[in-house]
A protein has these predicted regions:
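Phosphate-binding/catalytic loop of phosphoryl-transfer enzymes
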Residues: 1-35
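An extended, acidic
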Residues: 11-13, 23-26, 36-183
């Protein structure tokens, strides 16, 4: 049985249940669990942001959905968000089924720090297909400072094409008053 995803991350023959393997500098490969067939994957490269969408947690308390959606809208994403849990959001991004994954500090706990195990594997999968993963300030994620990303603030993962636009939107002051989080 494959993963329970709200989108189909499947082979062209309809086979479900896949594994993503990424090696720094060698790309990301998608492997079908049942057949063993594999192929390299690439991030969505289109500049048509009308077809892009945000990936977000089903559990809206896992982040700041108001700010996350405001940023997605500010960079032109208009499709309904793709809601799923776990690192499957990174998989959807790597396969081009989403263009952006944002996870900003909770409104209830603006000093919250992410756990490395929630992002390390997904980050390399996205980066190796040509996407980018940073924090809200554009800094690379620091996976070498313990079990939490204490040197980072939030997560911005993109197909690469949108990344600088997202960081620019985050620097805009007008997004923050309505979202109860400060820069």
């Amino acid at each position: 049985m494959g993963p329970a995803l709200s989108v189909s991350i499947a082979q062209s023959d309809g086979e479900k249940g896949v594994l993503f393997v990424a090696v720094r500098g060698q790309g990301t490969t998608l492997i079908a669990l049942k057949s063993g067939h594999s192929h390299p994957i690439n991030a969505a490269s289109t500049q048509n942001t009308g077809n892009f969408r945000l990936a977000e947690s089903i559990e809206l308390g896992h982040g700041n959905p108001t700010l996350q959606r405001a940023v997605a809208q500010a960079v032109g994403l208009s499709a309904p968000p793709l809601q799923m849990d776990s690192q499957a959001k990174y998989a959807a991004l790597a396969c081009g089924q989403a263009a952006l994954y944002l996870r900003f500090p909770w409104i209830q706990d603006p000093d919250y720090k992410e756990n490395i195990w929630d992002h390390a594997a997904g980050a390399i999968v996205v980066e190796e297909v040509g996407g980018r993963v940073t924090d809200m300030d554009g800094k690379p994620l620091d996976f070498f400072c313990g079990v939490q990303l204490v040197n980072n603030r939030g997560i911005v993962a993109s197909n690469g094409a949108l990344h600088e636009h997202v960081l620019a939107a985050l620097r805009r002051n007008d997004l923050y008053p309505a979202t109860s989080i400060s820069k």
